[in-house]
Amino acid sequence: MAQDLSEKDLLKMEVEQLKKEVKNTRIPISKAGKEIKEYVEAQAGNDPFLKGIPEDKNPFKEKGGCLIS
């Protein structure tokens, strides 16, 4: 699709995208990193990768064994 557009059209699209992006609220990475860390630590108790899945609720647990005779 981009190949079908002229350079002028591509530049217009880029300007429109930049106009949208300039409206975004920006925060320093130090603050964003701290907020992400706090969120992850707060949600750690609900994370099955950290907490594990109870055996009775594990959908991937094998239902039966394999018997080769």
From Swiss-Prot:
Tissue: Retinal cones.
Topological relation to the membrane, as annotated: Lipid-anchor
Gene Ontology molecular functions: G-protein beta-subunit binding; GTPase activity
GO biological process, one term: G protein-coupled receptor signaling pathway
Propeptide: 67-69
Domain of life the protein comes from: Eukaryota
SMART domains: G_gamma, GGL
PANTHER family (alphabetical): GUANINE NUCLEOTIDE-BINDING PROTEIN GAMMA SUBUNIT
Quaternary context: G proteins are composed of 3 units, alpha, beta and gamma.
Family under the similarity heading: Belongs to the G protein gamma family.
Protein name as catalogued: Guanine nucleotide-binding protein G(I)/G(S)/G(O) subunit gamma-T2
High-level lineage: Eukaryota, Metazoa, Chordata, Craniata, Vertebrata
